[in-house]
């Protein structure tokens, strides 16, 4: 029942994310939205990374759950980098996001591919399958953060 409810909520969230830019009344709302989405993603990815590094015991069920959440939510923050959110709004987003949108889009696509593979690897149910997918996803995150996020 809990999984069904979570799936419904996540599916609804993803479906509404596509027109999300139109939902923000103020640029500050978009910034808060993308920061919140990134926080949730980081929390769930952190558990996967800890398992891959041996800092947490491997739990196939938890890995599959967390990877699915990461893969589902990964698309959400990118709907909130719209017009007007490039000003100083207490955000770490660099101007490069808006100056080179093609490069930013390429980084997004790399992340989306990595999280899809992460989700599949976690479903395999083995730590050996999970480790390289966590590494690739971490690299995709880092690549975007290096180019588009201030320290």
Where is each model-derived feature located?
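Bacterial N-terminal signal peptides that target proteins for export
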Residues: 1-8
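Sequence context surrounding c-type heme c attachment/ligation sites in exported
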Residues: 24, 28-60, 66-151
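N-terminal signal peptide c-region/cleavage motif recognized by signal peptidases
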Residues: 17-19
């Amino acid at each position: 029942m809990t999984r069904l409810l979570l799936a419904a909520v996540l599916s609804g969230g993803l479906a509404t994310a596509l027109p999300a830019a139109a939902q923000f009344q103020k640029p500050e709302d978009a910034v808060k939205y993308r920061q919140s989405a990134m926080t949730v993603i980081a929390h769930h990815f952190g558990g996967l990374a800890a398992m891959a590094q041996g800092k947490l015991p491997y739990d196939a069920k938890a890995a599959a759950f967390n990877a699915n959440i990461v893969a589902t939510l990964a698309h959400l923050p990118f709907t909130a980098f719209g017009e007007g959110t490039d000003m100083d709004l207490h955000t770490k987003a660099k101007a490069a996001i808006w100056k080179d949108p093609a490069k930013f889009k390429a980084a997004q696509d790399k992340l989306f591919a990595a999280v899809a593979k992460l989700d599949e690897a976690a479903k395999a149910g083995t730590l050996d399958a999970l480790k390289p997918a966590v590494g690739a996803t971490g690299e995709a995150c880092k690549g975007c953060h290096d180019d588009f996020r201030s320290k």
